[in-house]
């Protein structure tokens, strides 16, 4: 088996329906590590469910890997990878260093659980796009879909997102705040309560998603960027997940638009 230290922390570019050609940065690479354990996670069952921030990979290795990568072919640089990127304490430092190399836009995909922490918000504020996951309108659904680390509540997540929105405004940043909702059997009938939260947060954009990547029976570094044909390379059995029908997705999109008046994009094309 290849040692993780010999694998690049930078992967892709991979095609993303939301942002085009996306170069992935994996700040974790230490098994799958996240403050959530989503039932649909492309990494499979999360091996280290934690809220504790730490250094996983040195900034030096990440910048070195970045320089050796195909970053020039990417439309956007996305922090995602083998878990929750805000768990890495060098997230802010890596963003600053990459901004010295290129002016390509930077996106962070986060579950929002650590945004309550001012230091984490300071780390993400230099990104051009922050996409925050919000699948559940209450703690019961949060536990069912996202299975968070102990102590994470919907209230703390919403508070963190609102604080981030205020920071963006107060500091006059051009950072776009996107809320991403993964629709599952557990939340597809909770549109009104999700719309209520969206109206409180008032993000710049809402991205509607449904699990298009399979759920692997184990973690393998390749799962961080695997989709389409790549999923055949995952060494564990994979399970396709229940997705919404086009009709259901369109109904949800229309209803959310009617209830929120927000800018909405969807993985489902017409
Ligand atoms: S937040 Fe993302 S990385 Fe974490 S378990 Fe959910 S889908 Fe996986």
What kind of region is each of these model predictions?
Residues 27, 79-81, 181-183:
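Short glycine-centered, acidic/aromatic-flanked micro-motifs in structured strand/loop junctions
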Residues 2-18, 29, 64, 187-270:
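Auxiliary Fe-S-binding modules of radical SAM enzymes
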Residues 4, 17-57:
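Canonical Radical SAM [4Fe-4S] cluster-binding loop centered on the CxxxCxxC motif
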Residues 51-54, 144-151, 222-223, 238-242:
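Short glycine-enriched, charge-decorated loop/helix-capping segments at active-site entrances
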Residues 38, 74, 127-128:
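Short, well-ordered alpha-helix to beta-strand connector turns
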Residues 73-74, 79-81, 98, 106-107:
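Glycine/small-residue-rich loop that forms an oxyanion/phosphate-binding "nest" at active or ligand-binding sites
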Residues 86-222:
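Conserved AdoMet/S-adenosylmethionine-binding subsite of the radical SAM
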Residues 44-79, 93:
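Conserved alpha-helical substructure of the radical SAM core
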């Amino acid at each position: 088996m290849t040692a993780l230290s010999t694998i690049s922390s930078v992967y892709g570019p991979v095609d993303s329906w939301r942002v085009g050609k996306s170069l992935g940065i994996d700040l974790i690479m230490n098994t799958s590590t996240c403050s959530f354990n989503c039932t649909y996670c492309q990494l499979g069952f999360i091996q280290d469910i934690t809220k504790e921030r730490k250094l996983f990979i040195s900034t030096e290795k990440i910048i070195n890997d970045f320089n050796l990568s195909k970053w020039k072919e990417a439309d956007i640089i996305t922090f995602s990878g083998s878990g929750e990127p805000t768990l890495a304490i060098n997230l802010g430092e890596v963003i600053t260093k990459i901004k010295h190399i290129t002016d390509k836009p930077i996106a962070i995909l986060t579950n929002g659980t650590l945004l309550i922490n001012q230091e984490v918000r300071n780390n993400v504020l230099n990104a051009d796009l922050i996409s925050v996951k919000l699948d559940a309108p209450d703690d019961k659904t949060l536990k069912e879909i996202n299975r968070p680390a102990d102590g994470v509540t919907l209230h703390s997540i919403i508070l963190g997102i609102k604080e981030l929105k205020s920071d963006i405004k107060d500091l006059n940043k051009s950072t776009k705040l996107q809320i991403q909702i993964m629709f599952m059997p557990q939340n597809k009938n909770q549109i009104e309560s999700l719309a209520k939260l969206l109206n409180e947060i008032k993000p710049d954009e809402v991205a509607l998603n449904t699990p298009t990547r399979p759920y692997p029976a184990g973690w393998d570094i390749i799962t961080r960027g695997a989709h389409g044909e790549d999923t055949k390379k995952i060494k564990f059995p994979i399970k396709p997940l229940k997705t919404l029908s086009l009709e259901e997705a369109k109904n949800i999109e229309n209803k959310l638009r009617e209830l929120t008046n927000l800018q909405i994009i969807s993985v489902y094309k017409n």
